[in-house]
């Protein structure tokens, strides 16, 4: 019998796809949740922002971004402001039109201000808060030519006090659409992701390579890699400082005669002390483009997602991982299956999921690339 339950949590002011948007939902210091930007049903970049009030259980429209964007990164700063970086400024098409701009949201003023310009325009990158309050932006995708893209190894750091961007050491491997998490002791782990190798992003190479950033030196070092390449996966930091990687798939698998139609059900656990990954029990089913959060109990809740090959329909299913025993149990299903959606843990421990795609491609309505949802749901353990 599954534990916990889902309940409706109002609707966003608009439908939104959040593909490639790192940390799309950010919980503010006052407990509200902010979602900014994203794509419409044709993956056109949007400037709309919204705030969820847990006490009212409702969403309200907030001040729009200064520049419409999708595939961007959203980071909560130590002073309570929110940093939005990069992204793509064009609709679905090839190549992307990456942005170098950044914006800062001040919850007290309820407005956005200029966050300066990065040294490199990028989308599908990671943006991680460092212990000293700065933000590390790494990797992503940019245009290579008029009809091709390339992944980036470069990284840069934003200082909220000065408002300045400075370059830092480059990663060993160029990558985009990769998750990144802060480690105990101040380092940052980036794991897996995607590397552009051809004109079509669907046939890029999935990566098993992982590396760590050291803020004290501004350098990267390679660390243990996954047992299998992953993209569209999630990283979740556990209470003991280890990191759980779940799901994803290898976009190049089909071209190498190794189709992975249902995505990876496998999970791996990273130990920062040894720099190695260990195999964990498989999830009840494979999934990519899902969300995963740590619950107040220490367990990990994995939600939604889709298969890695076509990704035509969002999953309603959820699963819970108990790190004490290394086991998975099936959780209660969401009311709406969703892909590329936002998720955040509220101050009271409930989990909010919002937006995303319900169906894509041939499974979506005629004349639309995506079937989106504006619905939100709350999970109570």
What role is predicted for each listed range?
Residues 1-381:
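Kelch-like beta-propeller repeat domains
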């Amino acid at each position: 019998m599954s534990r916990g339950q889902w309940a409706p949590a109002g609707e966003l002011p608009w439908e939104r796809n959040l593909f490639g948007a790192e940390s799309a939902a950010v919980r503010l210091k006052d407990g509200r949740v902010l979602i900014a930007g994203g794509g419409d049903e044709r993956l056109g970049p949007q400037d709309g922002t919204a705030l969820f009030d847990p006490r009212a259980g409702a969403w309200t429209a907030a001040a729009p971004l200064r520049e419409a964007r999708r595939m961007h990164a959203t980071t909560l700063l130590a002073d309570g402001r929110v940093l939005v970086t990069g992204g793509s400024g064009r609709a679905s098409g090839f190549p992307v039109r990456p942005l170098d701009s950044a914006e800062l949201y001040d919850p007290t003023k309820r407005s956005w201000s200029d966050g300066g310009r990065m040294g490199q325009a990028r989308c599908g990158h990671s943006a991680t808060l460092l212990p000293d309050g700065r933000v590390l932006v790494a990797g992503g995708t940019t245009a290579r030519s008029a009809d091709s893209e390339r992944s980036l190894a470069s990284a840069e750091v934003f200082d909220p006090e000065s408002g300045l961007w400075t370059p830092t050491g480059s990663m060993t491997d160029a990558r985009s659409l990769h998750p990144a998490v802060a480690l105990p002791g101040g380092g940052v782990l980036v794991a897996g992701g995607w590397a552009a190798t051809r004109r079509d992003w669907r046939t890029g190479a999935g990566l098993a390579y992982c590396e760590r950033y050291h803020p004290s030196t501004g350098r990267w070092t390679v660390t243990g890699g996954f047992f299998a390449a992953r993209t569209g996966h999630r990283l979740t930091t556990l209470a003991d400082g280890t990191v759980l990687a779940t799901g994803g798939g290898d976009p190049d698998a089909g071209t190498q005669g190794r189709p992975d139609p249902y995505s990876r059900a496998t999970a791996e656990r990273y130990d920062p002390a040894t720099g190695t990954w260990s195999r964990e029990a498989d999830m009840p089913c494979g999934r990519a483009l899902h969300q995963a959060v740590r619950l107040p109990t220490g367990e990990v809740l994995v939600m939604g997602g889709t298969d890695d090959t076509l990704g035509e329909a969002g999953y309603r299913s959820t699963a819970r991982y108990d790190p004490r025993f290394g086991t998975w149990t099936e959780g209660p299903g969401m009311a709406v299956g969703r892909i590329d959606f936002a998720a955040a843990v509220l101050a009271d421990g409930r989990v909010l999921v919002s937006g995303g795609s319900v169906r894509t491609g041939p499974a979506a309505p005629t004349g639309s690339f995506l079937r989106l949802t504006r619905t939100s749901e709350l999970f109570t353990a």
